[in-house]
Amino acid sequence: MKTVVQWEYDFRKWSENMIERSQVDVNQTWDLSHLFKTEEVFNEALEDLKGKVEAFQKEYEGQITTAHQVNVGLATYRALLEQRGKISAYCNLAVSANTRDKEAQTRAAQTRTVLAGLDAKLSFFESELSQLDDAVLEEARANKEDALYIERLLEDKKHLLSKDVEAT
């Protein structure tokens, strides 16, 4: 079994032998422009997501009472998660493509911080859905787009503790 010192030595040797990304044939690299054409477009998408999350939180937090609101909310939530995933992929793939790129590392770290904050703002949604009456969720389940999600939510709901029990 290798010691920590041996692993560190192996890693240093491996990293010394790595070629620079600029030396790699462009046909062997990821083209991240399919996600965002430019850094500016990426930054605009991140700002757009921040605004959409704020609006979503204002519109839905403490306001979901009907099956229609559940369905519209879930459609919006899916779109937010899709945009979030694209932003996250762009940052993480840029770092994976070139681990020596300090700019990409900084952008990824800053973006992860922003996304964590947005995730916290969105966390109310699934929690509030799980607190809805089963009849409302069953009605919302009629929407094919939401059926599987709501089916799982109803199943998970059986195992949730009440707010009073959670508080103790």
Q: Can you name each region flagged by the protein language model?
A:
Residues 5-168:
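A well-structured
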